[in-house]
Amino acid sequence: MFSIVLAFLTAGCGSRLEWYPPPEQRPSLSLPSSLPFGYFVAMSDPNAGAYIVGGFRDQSEGVWRWTHERPVLQFYVPRAPRLRLLVDLTFPDQTFAQTGPVELTIRLNGKEFDRVRYAKPGSQEYTKDTPWEWLHPDAVNTVALEPDKTAAGPDGERLGFVLTRAGFVE
């Protein structure tokens, strides 16, 4: 019995070890430490207000924030081989019942970058490769997310959509 156990234990042992090189390393997106904001923000971040240029409700509702007619964010975009703009947003049932389908115009640094039509309420994820000629590398960049329609809130406030997170990813 001992010889059977010993045979099983040594069966996988071999004298030849295969060697594999480590995967290619590249630096992660890095930012100057003096900036109050970076290349991506979640609305749950206590520092989310530093990214907001305008067009948002003043207070956050926890992990998300209401937008108004022309929400604008600012990001510091470091040099990277390839970046995508990512936006997680929600069109709540209550406001969508007033607006119907919404067309969102996305502007990068003041230039129209894309138009997207959202035909149903609920959570949505927008992502698109961002050509370097649209960005200012190692500098502050603005992203405007303009809905073509807004809904009237209970106090008359114009509500666009709910933003959860946005920014640039590799």
Located regions from the model:
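Solvent-exposed serine/threonine-rich low-complexity stretches and specific carbohydrate-binding patches
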Residues: 110-121
